[in-house]
């Protein structure tokens, strides 16, 4: 799940109606460009609406971004003022509702239809914002490269870091128009996670990653090919092994129970959602229904296989692989 958001961006319906602002579902507006600025500043904003603020308030939020918010309802303005008075940071633009005074003002920039120039300008604004925020904000996860876009999710004691390579250049397809950079380029970055210790696994490569513990958190290196993305699992302990228990035999029309445990080196259930590949293979070597990818929540997975009337009799194989460290286990059952 997404962690509680400490950065939020308001999409104002009132400003859409009375000032002609808003994205209307497209990515060509100033509001959409502000979202890109936040992304390249390595922030993870949550989208808020006026009714969200009125219903839930702004508790837990540290930074509130208000692009294209020329006109706001009085009660929303009052909520934002209370947020700011309690220490919250407000980032606005040159068109911000005059009843609110922003702590930082983004200069509105219109697209030039030159993709490389527009991206460079927005990334420059992102870097200026980063430098200003350093005095009042601490990044939960950060990247040394703006083109490595990060997103953080959590499950119990574990954190999941998504890293996507956004470095691109003009290609041979539509690049000559200068509006789209459609060819990906490789990119490397250092990722830092504000966490004291832990073990890092690359869920795409299915292996452990070398990570360094530093005073400000956990650090590791990421290499991404053109257009490539990776998911990293960060957890408090190493995976120790797999355990498999299953029904030893079942008649046609019966049921096979398959229980998988992912454990640490002490044999305790692993405190994370670990992706599992489960293969159910008949005596002829063909994968059966039920084969696929499953989550082992807090290290546990329980699956059931219903033996079909036309399934082959004989010795079946269960193949289990956890996709963090790549460990595998094989079991069997007999269909009578």
Show the residue positions of the predicted features.
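Edge beta-strands of extracellular beta-sandwich domains
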Residues: 242-246, 292, 327-336
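Short, surface-exposed loop/turn segments at beta-strand-coil junctions that are enriched for proline
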Residues: 304-312
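Short, aromatic- and glycine-rich surface loops/edge beta-strands on solvent-exposed regions
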Residues: 230-234, 313-324
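A glycine-anchored, Pro-Gly-centered beta-turn/N-cap motif
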Residues: 272, 297-299, 312-319
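Aromatic sugar-binding surface patches on proteins
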Residues: 295-305
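Carbohydrate-binding surfaces of carbohydrate-active enzymes
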Residues: 1-257, 261-275
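Short amphipathic beta-strand segments in non-cytosolic proteins
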Residues: 276-293
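Short, exposed coil/turn segments at beta-strand boundaries within extracellular/luminal domains
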Residues: 286, 324-329
